[in-house]
């Protein structure tokens, strides 16, 4: 799912710094999430999705479809 969030961020034209600002976090938070060094809890996943401008349910549906 993280790969989908990274691609969505890039498609939205957002840098890690810009996404971090939207979340009230530093760029290092975004980097660690994207590198798999830090996991997101459900609330953080929803916040990141919304900050990128995508529906969190759409990310989940896409991830589920990719595994089947």
Language-model regions: role of each:
Residues 37-47:
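Short, basic-rich loop-to-helix N-cap that marks the start of a DNA-contacting helix
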Residues 50, 58-68:
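Short, charged recognition helix plus adjacent turn
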Residues 3-22:
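Short basic helix-loop element that most often maps to the first helix and adjoining turn
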Residues 26, 37, 63-67:
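The DNA-recognition helices of helix-turn-helix-type DNA-binding domains
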Residues 17, 28, 38, 57:
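Key DNA-contact positions within bacterial/archaeal DNA-binding proteins
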């Amino acid at each position: 799912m993280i790969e989908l969030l990274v691609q969505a961020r890039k498609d939205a034209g957002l840098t890690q710094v810009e996404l971090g600002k939207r979340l009230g976090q530093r760029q290092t938070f975004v980097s660690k999430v994207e590198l798999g060094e830090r996991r997101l809890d459900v609330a953080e996943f929803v916040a990141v999705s919304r900050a990128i401008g995508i529906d969190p349910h759409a990310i989940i549906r896409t991830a589920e479809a990719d595994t089947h």
